[in-house]
């Protein structure tokens, strides 16, 4: 209930130990995190950070209250309208006119062009899945960041994309289902990367010759219908361990390893097809997490900092074994012109900041009231992104993406 939530916030505030920084009361734990971890190896001093935050709060905290009050006023007017018109036939034109009058709707303006610069291709030109993950959980955040490249074979075998009959159900590996997975993968290649005069179902090998993909059926050689879809390979050109193709700015990697278990049923020795999948991920500080005090917020901020620095790790135990999860490296290939080629190994990470409504006891204003949590998020998450702007492991254009 709302009362319990409020009580939780009050208890959190009572448990905080504060230190005075200028006119702010800052949680000692948060202050230590910012000064010792967040700002380390950046060009921002702790003095500039805290004075800048205070100056921003002086200007925007009152504005934040005004916006919340405006929203409350809008909601009351809308509630009153519905009460007044209860039981009447709904008239869309009248309702729209009312919403325009109170400022809830605005008349559409003239056409405009987005002029934002330094936008990564994952935002500007690649259409692909976007994940949302609670940044408070390091393991989940790492899983999402690493979901840029995923196995098509695993995805097909372990889900109901391919219907599983009762006769083929087995706790052990089901070779019949394995054949269906391979068939699905070949049909997928035929659909998006068709060969001139041959189905992928009938190939026996592939190689790279003079910067072009050559697909073999015995001694016969075939080409892609669209040779521009071939991007590069890994391994020896005569017997590559992987080839990389591209369609609609999304890559797939065809792995060849005749020794792999998955390749035992495959007459071409293909062991898997890896799809470029979650091209971006929102690391969420709001709806999917419950961070009510400095201790909670530091967990969120520290995980985001680790993602931006590229050193976030998570250890966990599964079936009696200890595992460590970390960020995947970038993927290296040989391009079709014989040069080195690197592709991004993980999702482009965005960070979602808390909205206007919530406050947090991690920092108290000069009047003793709690800081608007969204402003605190904005300062700390962007400060964390300074580490990536310098190294460009997440955004290759030197940008940080804030979801509000």
Predicted segments, located by residue:
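N-terminal amphipathic/basic-hydrophobic helices that include classical n-h-c signal peptides
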Residues: 1-13
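Catalytic alpha/beta active-site cores
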Residues: 12-17, 94-97, 101-404
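N-terminal-proximal low-complexity accessory segments that begin disordered
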Residues: 12-106, 114
